[in-house]
């Protein structure tokens, strides 16, 4: 990894789960190296910056991190083995939040968790512990909505769903739809982050980027889904006009989800 001579280190990683897990792995390498060289207690002086850009500091060492699948798997297995699957899920969900500080928060959480083990759940007064659980809670709250709001259309070759979640929802909700539609070809595209997950019938899922998704769209003839119109008619004719409450509807189904819900288009 090279010598570390600065008091503060900023690790800059790719803007995805694997990039962050790689940075977390390297953060612990640097942390252990700094403690060995300086014989001091770690002071949370390593942070993780996600994606390009960000603020530079004259008093920090900026290190670019290249995503490494081996480091990703080692990090995941270590968390699961030492802290348990429940805490791993909490960490994973927190990393799917949109906060720019989510990786640094999770790093601070893991530094503390590896010291006390699963008893970290009892340390809710700690800033990092509290923030990780809060990020995870918000991600799960949105995931509950997404599972109900996502809409698939059938183009004759596969089912396609578009959505624009605030958090990175594909890693969180895709297994719900894999379990629900194991025998279907389907694609879920995140218009905000411009990537998609593809589920071939009875096979493993994989990710594609925006360019690959556009190629997939062009390769399939446009076909109207007749059930879309039937669903619109059903939606419009099953409501009770006397009980129409737009404010309540907005609370239960916020407007930013409706763009990709066929009954509102």
Residue ranges and their predicted role:
Residues 185, 196-197, 216-265:
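Long, compositionally biased intrinsically disordered terminal regions
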Residues 47-144:
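Charged, alpha-helical interface segments at or near domain boundaries
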Residues 3, 119-207:
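Internal, well-folded beta-alpha domain core
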Residues 6-67:
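N-terminal ordered "arm"
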Residues 1-8, 264-265:
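Short, Lys/Arg-enriched, disordered terminal segments
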Residues 19-30, 107-109, 172-179, 229-236:
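Short, hydrophobic/amphipathic alpha-helical patches that form generic packing surfaces
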Residues 6-11, 159, 213-216:
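Glycine- and acidic
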Residues 61-67, 203-216:
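Acidic, Ser/Thr-rich peripheral helices and adjacent loops at domain boundaries
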